[in-house]
């Protein structure tokens, strides 16, 4: 039951726009901003004027790096009802996957944009899976219908076959490629023909005879798909009755929110065709904050969970999903308010860090301009100035409440690293500050300093990711830096179970030191990370020393015996030990834990793990043999091939260490006619002969 206080939420939509790089996502967002009246002229990505791409590098490169959040308003066509649409434009480049993860976590619905000449591309698949993981309902937009090779059918087939989803086309294109002149609305059975370039003059008409049979067949399929999720419609369908437009819209909405069907629309954002109808579909089919399951939080030290319904009068629950350094106001924390109301000037409790923090000013964002507000209510997205400690994925609740944690954000491990040093010694400190600020904004970017060599290394998700961060260091923090060649972020692990002990005893006059632990270490499945278990019985290791022993073990994991890389995928069980009434201390047990772990890894048949990338190369048939031969020579495992138009897509798993400089080699092999995408898939053991070579380096 919706209360009066919640009624504004019925007309709220929090959506993300996500796709493969170059599918036309930012252009689609720009058009939405133009038609909702947030911008007075249309920003084109290819002339570097896009409003949403507000970082300098984004405008130069024509790709979206940070997820900009914008509030826009839209009146549903043919009605006076105004809707608030919060849009997050997410990057399509694989190196920026964390941005997509973050935005998926705080959305209620998404628009997946596909290039209709390419169908479902690899990054679109990744984004779709992320949306599946976070349970985000979505609609699909088959963009670029005017492009050579455009095919609405290709997109529908790919959604079914590559994504395993049920597409429900609610529109049909009137012609494609150069003949694309309008869109047929299958739900309302009307044709929309565009008569000017800006897409603002639309003539609505009956469906032309040439499309009548095809559209009638598609409408019958749409009603059948909608009837599967709506009992009332099913009864009408079985009795041969024709549903009204309202009944059909209501059933499609229900199926979309339950993630059983995925409405598919078509258009050309660049040519301004189909964008207003896309906005109508966002309003018609994607959920309001009241229609998605209420977020749950886990109560500290218990299995209990608490529900936070979307209600501005409820208890405050918010999630910080992005940190940004702003040249004018300092640190901006982007938040999604799930429940309650956040007031400027109030105090909040950061449950993730167990710290109290003060809210300064509150902003609603429009790409790179902002509007100051006094409060953010349940269902809203905004930015906070003044929070000192909040990080990505932190839970913010009302000051003084019990500690409750919302589900955080999955942060992938970086796979590539490089050494970095300032060009002048004078910039050393400035570089340190700049890198630290960049790492605060981006949890997939790590900065490490080697105490012995004094060398600083940075690690991230790919070459482009690190290149852009080094570029930002220069632009935003005025630090010129030299970087080394990219290196692979290896990991180490054990391959057999061992029992070991760590004993730290020091007697040198006065009070001594005594710590003693016995542990069992065993290998885990790849990707399982590290698991610690305390199974001490009878107090042989007192409770107050378990934590320090665990800390020592975890610190020792940071550097393995073979190459000094972190040790992963193992379980350590602390099962026994002994202590001394006087000499035992937290420090002694921490050292004992660390000693035990180092010995366990030495004795546990250690192995080196390397990141394996999922690579897809799109190549004309004539060059396919060369590409496959080359991937095999890079220790690649070919997973399969798939025809796409007159090209082939070769899919393979290839170690990252073999992929440096691949773009250049691929272009020269195919005279520039192939393209590829690559993203991290899993870690795998390095063959023995290569492990020996790595250790000699």
UniProtKB/Swiss-Prot annotation:
Q: What is its main location?
A: cytoplasm
Q: Pfam families attached here?
A: EFG_C (PF00679), EFG_III (PF14492), EFG_IV (PF03764), GTP_EFTU (PF00009), GTP_EFTU_D2 (PF03144)
What CDD domains does its record include? EF-G (cd01886), EFG_III (cd16262), EFG_mtEFG1_IV (cd01434), EFG_mtEFG_C (cd03713), EFG_mtEFG_II (cd04088)
Q: Which GO terms describe its molecular function?
A: GTP binding; GTPase activity; translation elongation factor activity
Q: Which SUPFAM superfamilies match?
A: EF-G C-terminal domain-like, P-loop containing nucleoside triphosphate hydrolases, Ribosomal protein S5 domain 2-like, Translation proteins
Sites binding GTP sit at 19-26, 89-93, 143-146
GO cellular component terms, alphabetically, are: cytoplasm
Role: Catalyzes the GTP-dependent ribosomal translocation step during translation elongation. During this step, the ribosome changes from the pre-translocational (PRE) to the post-translocational (POST) state as the newly formed A-site-bound peptidyl-tRNA and P-site-bound deacylated tRNA move to the P and E sites, respectively. Catalyzes the coordinated movement of the two tRNA molecules, the mRNA and conformational changes in the ribosome.
Recorded protein name is Elongation factor G
């Amino acid at each position: 039951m919706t209360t009066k206080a919640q009624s504004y939420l019925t007309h709220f939509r929090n959506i993300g726009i996500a796709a493969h790089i170059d599918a036309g996502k930012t252009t689609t967002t720009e058009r939405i901003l133009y038609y909702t009246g947030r911008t007075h002229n249309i920003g084109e990505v290819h002339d570097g004027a896009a409003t949403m791409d507000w970082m300098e590098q984004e405008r130069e490169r024509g790709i979206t790096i940070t997820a900009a959040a914008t509030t826009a308003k839209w009146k549903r066509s043919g009605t006076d009802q105004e809707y608030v649409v919060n849009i997050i434009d997410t990057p399509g480049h694989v190196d920026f996957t964390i941005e997509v993860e973050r935005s998926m976590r705080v959305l209620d619905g998404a628009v997946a944009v596909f290039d209709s000449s390419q169908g479902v591309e690899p990054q679109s698949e990744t984004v779709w899976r992320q949306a599946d993981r976070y349970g985000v309902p979505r609609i699909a937009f088959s963009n670029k219908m005017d492009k050579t090779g455009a095919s609405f059918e290709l997109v529908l087939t790919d959604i079914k076959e590559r994504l395993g989803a049920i597409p429900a086309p609610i529109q049909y294109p009137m012609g494609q490629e150069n003949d694309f002149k309008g869109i047929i609305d299958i739900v309302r059975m009307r044709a929309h023909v565009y008569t000017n370039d800006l897409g603002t003059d639309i003539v609505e008409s009956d469906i032309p005879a040439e499309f009548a049979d095809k559209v009638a067949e598609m409408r019958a399929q749409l009603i059948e798909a909608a009837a599967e999720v709506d009992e009332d419609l099913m009864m009408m369908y079985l009795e041969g009755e024709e549903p009204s437009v309202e009944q059909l819209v209501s059933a499609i909405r229900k199926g979309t929110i339950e993630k059983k069907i995925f409405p598919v629309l078509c258009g050309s954002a660049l040519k301004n065709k189909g964008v207003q109808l896309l906005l109508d579909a966002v309003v018609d089919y994607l959920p309001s904050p009241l229609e998605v399951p209420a977020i749950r939080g886990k109560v500290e030290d218990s299995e209990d969970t608490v529900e936070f319904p979307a209600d501005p009068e409820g208890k405050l629950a918010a999630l910080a999903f992005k940190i940004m350094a702003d040249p004018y106001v300092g640190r901006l924390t982007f938040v999604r308010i799930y429940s309650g109301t956040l007031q400027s000037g109030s105090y909040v409790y950061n449950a993730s860090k167990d710290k109290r923090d003060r809210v300064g000013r509150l902003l609603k964002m429009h790409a790179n301009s902002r509007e100051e507000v006094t409060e953010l209510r349940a269902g809203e997205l905004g930015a906070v100035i003044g929070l000192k400690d909040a990080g990505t994925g932190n839970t913010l609740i009302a000051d003084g409440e019990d500690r409750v944690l919302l589900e955080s954000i999955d942060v992938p491990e970086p796979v590539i690293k490089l050494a970095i040093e300032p060009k002048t010694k004078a910039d050393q400190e400035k570089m340190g500050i700049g890198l630290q600020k960049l790492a605060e904004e981006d949890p997939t970017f790590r900065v490490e300093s080697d105490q012995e060599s004094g060398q600083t290394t940075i690690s991230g998700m790919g070459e482009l990711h690190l290149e852009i961060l080094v570029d930002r260091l220069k632009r935003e923090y005025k630090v010129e830096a030299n970087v080394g060649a990219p290196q692979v972020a290896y990991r180490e692990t054990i391959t057999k179970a061992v029992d070991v002990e760590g004993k730290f005893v020091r007697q040198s006059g006065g009070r001594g030191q005594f710590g003693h632990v016995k542990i069992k270490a065993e290998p885990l499945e790849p990707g399982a990370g590290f698991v610690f278990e305390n199974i001490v019985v009878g107090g042989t290791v007192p409770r107050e020393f378990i934590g320090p022993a665990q800390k020592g073990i975890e610190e020792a994991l940071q550097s393995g015996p073979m190459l000094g890389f972190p040790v992963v995928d193992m379980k350590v069980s602390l099962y026994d030990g002994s202590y001394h009434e006087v000499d035992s201390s937290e420090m002694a047990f921490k050292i004992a834990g660390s000693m035990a772990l180092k010995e366990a890894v030495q004795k546990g048949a250690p192995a080196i793990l390397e990141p394996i990338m999922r690579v897809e190369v799109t190549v004309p048939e004539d060059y396919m043999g060369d590409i496959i031969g080359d991937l095999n020579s890079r220790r690649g495992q070919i997973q399969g091939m798939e025809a796409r138009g007159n090209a082939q897509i070769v899919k393979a798993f290839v170690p990252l260490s073999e992929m440096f400089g691949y773009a250049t080699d691929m272009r020269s092999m195919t005279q520039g006619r192939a393209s590829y995408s690559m993203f991290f898939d899993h870690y795998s053991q390095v063959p023995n002969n290569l492990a020996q070579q790595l250790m000699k380096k």
